[in-house]
Amino acid sequence: LPARQTLYEYYHDKFGFGAKTGIELGEASGYIYPPDSAEGNEVRYSAMTYGQSMNLTMVQVAAGFSSLVNGGQYYKPTVLVGTIDESGNLKSSENKVIRQTVSGGTSSQMRTMLTTARRSSFLSKSDKSGYEIGGKTGTSEAVVNGAYTQKETIATYIGYGGGKNGAEYVIMVRVAAPGKGINLQGNLHAGPIFTDISNWMIDYMKIA
């Protein structure tokens, strides 16, 4: 139970998995079974360590991942750039730090691991040179009629990019073909989409 409790505290309490983020859009809370519940058994928690047996939204995952690469600070997700007053002046919204998820040292180590994974992939050949790009693929079994199936998979890729100031954006891509019986792969189907958006973001944000 202590090990499951620690994992639950990281996933739910620190990274916000299984809870609404408060973003200004309609959202689901998802769920993570508490370790002291009947469903929160050792088998389920073992599966949770590699991403199964829990229900998360992409906003939750992207927000939690952002804290892993920005020094450990969890920012409240928002779609608001700011507000415009009667004179037409834009007042930028303030970034709100909610909590610390990991230490700065852990965040730095995660970035090293993510950039290493990126550089070892064929995907990095299409990255703009001179920038820090890191990420990780995901290929998961789809759920059909309440059970995992090996006949259909979902492809994901989540990563970040930045320049001399460190991580400046996070992108998560999910590719699925429900009911088509297609085995999608993170590196082949989601990764290239991330690359295209990442290269565009560098130009759009004028990252140095």
Residue positions per predicted region:
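Glycine-rich loops and low-complexity Gly/Arg-rich segments
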Residues: 74-75, 158-160, 182-184, 195-199
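A short acidic/glycine-rich loop-to-helix N-cap element
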Residues: 177-189
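Short, gly/Ser/Thr-rich active-site loops of penicillin-recognizing serine hydrolases
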Residues: 89-97, 188-208
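A generic secondary-structure boundary signal that marks alpha-helix termini
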Residues: 70-74, 119, 180, 199-207
